[in-house]
Amino acid sequence: MISLRHFTTFLLRSSRSVGLMLMLFLTCSLVSCDKLPRNGKLDGHWQLMELNGTSVRHEGTYWSFQLDLLQLKSLTHSPITEVQYSGGVVARFEHRGDSLILTKGYLMNRDYQQDILIDSTHQADLTAYGITEFPMRYRVLLLTDEELTLIADHHRLVFRKF
């Protein structure tokens, strides 16, 4: 039979182990929190379905939001630019309430490990994506788990969650 002293020692060691495991788990959880979704329903992949009242669903234009980065893709369009780049467009954005601001856009130049800021020196026409300038300010008219509608000046963009 086990003595009370041995049993008490066993319990103390076990509770220390459980406490250490719990502390390790909480530390790991807190450290990794900065990569969790922070844009609510906006995070994820969206397909542009309608641009200014015209259906563009078959053009395969996509906006993907994560953290503060927006990736733009199109199966049928490329940015119109004279800048040499390896492909792809990304933008930094801010989302607060019913406001979405695309603050800066970049042409991805992965061949040289440096993205190119879209500005007056390095211009790119992104109208096929629904973007006419940077910064680009949209009002979020509708945002659900399935649909997103943005308004900017005379532009209306309707997306579906993909």
Protein language model features and the residues they cover:
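Contiguous, well-ordered beta-strand patches that form the walls/edges
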Residues: 51-60, 72-143
